[in-house]
Regions:
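OB-fold nucleic-acid-binding modules
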Residues: 1-202
Length: 202
């Protein structure tokens, strides 16, 4: 399920509930590239099945592909970057607009973010980020054109039990200065001439 109402308890839903409601009267919107449906008045929600129908998490090996799994339940084999190990997953002191993002890396050196909002602070603020690797699970949200993972609860973090790995360092891509389009990516430039213009005086 997604977020219904201002908080999960508005409709007394349990994890994995199957619900039905009419989209008539709602309008679609995008919040930092995540699709949402907003209503002028609260829709009537029918709970078709209140048991836990959570599907198995889909394994995604390339974080760049997370954008193709918006709102779906996924898992990624990864580890926290060194600078955040030992911190809490949700730290209100580093929160921005109620959100805390934590950077994780995969074996091939790619990175992605775990995103925690204020609703998850009640459990995420007491769990320490381990110096371990494993499968992180959660639902995919989109922010600024990139896929983030939002763990649903503490059980989505329990796969971090394996030894840390050494990420691969990809070979820089050879290119020209005019072809550099992506910040944070490694490039190798050959046969470049740098011209400086001095505008100061002695």
């Amino acid at each position: 399920k997604g977020f219904l109402g201002d908080k999960d308890t508005d409709y007394h839903l349990t994890r994995g509930s199957i619900v039905s409601f009419d989209l008539k009267g709602g309008f679609s919107k995008s919040y930092y590239d995540t699709y949402q449906v907003q209503f002028e008045a609260d829709p009537d929600i029918e709970i078709l099945d209140a048991s836990d129908n959570t599907p198995e998490a889909i394994e995604v090996s390339d974080p760049a592909k997370l954008i193709d799994y918006q709102s779906q339940y996924v898992k990624v084999y990864s580890q926290p970057i060194e600078s955040i190990r030992g911190e809490k997953y949700y730290d209100p002191q580093v929160a921005s607009s109620g959100y805390v993002n934590r950077v994780f890396e995969t074996k091939n050196g790619s990175t992605f973010q775990l995103s925690f909002n204020s609703y998850s602070s009640s459990w995420a603020n007491s769990i320490e980020i381990p110096a371990k690797a494993g499968y992180i699970k959660g639902c995919v949200s989109i922010n600024q054109g990139a896929g983030n993972i939002s763990p649903r609860n503490a059980s989505d973090l329990e796969g971090m039990t394996e030894d840390l790995f050494t990420p691969e360092t990809p070979d820089p891509e050879k290119t020209t200065i005019s072809q550099i389009t992506e910040a944070g990516r490694q490039y190798e430039i050959e046969s470049a001439t740098v011209v400086a213009t001095y505008t100061g005086g002695f």
